[in-house]
Amino acid sequence: MATKIVIDAGHGGSVDPGAVYKGREEKNDNLNLAMAVGKILSENGVDVVYTRTDDTYQTPFEKAQIANEDGADFFLSFHRNSSPMPNQYSGVESLVYDLSGTKAELAKNINGALGELGFKDLGVSARPGLVVLRRTRMP
């Protein structure tokens, strides 16, 4: 049985564009990245489920429910940070519910692999208050 990953493109719809800079909206960047990563994973035998494939809004509770009801093995949510200070968030950061077990190890491995491709590793941080991390039953 193939590994199942739910991929969430953070933000979406007219109510939640995420970070915006000079007309560029985070929700669109997240969707493009989610679809590209999902395609690569699918081509390599992973069963991919998307929380959204178009510009729609879902609450974090709905996103967690999709992952839980689909019986996903892993949940991956893409976001992009922004700051008025140049290059403050230039790199990759992974957020997990806590720093134990598979979730933390997987996040470190993802950051490391992206680091090998030239991305700055901004680390792995515990964020137990985030609904999609608190409500999903998988790493």
How would you label these PLM feature ranges?
Residues A2-G23:
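Short glycine-rich His-centered loop
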Residues A2-K4, R24, N28-P139:
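Active-site-proximal helix/loop segments of hydrolytic enzymes
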